[in-house]
């Protein structure tokens, strides 16, 4: 059975965050583990409060998982502060897991902010380069790329701009696009030719 670690916030209503990830993993026959970085008191209509976990405790949770379990993939969601991002990045660099998927969370579905606005530069400098796949939707891609997205060409330009920040692949999800939902994938293909002995 594959084992996937979710690093994200806890949603007490069960509709997002760690709880949603663990349900999804289970539904697909994957063993899910979790590192909680923030406890979010929220429901379907509002975010009541957010309590961030200390960077030290975040690091200890990551250590607890990696020292005992072989992790096949890591899925990262909400990282609310620069300190949280740095703690997670430090441990990912230490353990070097394969298959790191980052879906940066900036806002709750109801629009309430879940990421400190000052944390975007830390996300770009510290977290994005660790992503095997980065999966922002249009509003997140606009924030990261610092540009407005209103067309598929804009999505492509944002994907190229974000890709240059160091992730291995990016999928800009177009569910927030007016009209048809279009996703834009940007990645690098490395070809290693076979040497022939003469």
Give the location of each predicted region:
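Conserved N-terminal subdomain of the carbohydrate kinase-like
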Residues: 2-6, 26-109
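Short, basic, glycine/proline-bearing loop/turn elements
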Residues: 7-10, 105-110, 141-147
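Glycine/serine-rich anion-binding loops at beta->alpha junctions
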Residues: 7-26, 195
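Short amphipathic alpha-helices and their capping/turn segments at secondary-structure boundaries
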Residues: 22-23, 85-95, 120-129
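Short glycine-enriched, charge-decorated loop/helix-capping segments at active-site entrances
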Residues: 46-53, 112-117, 145-150
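Conserved phosphate/ATP/ADP-binding segment of small-molecule kinases
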Residues: 117-187
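Single conserved hydrophobic/aromatic residue that forms the stacking wall/gate
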Residues: 188-198
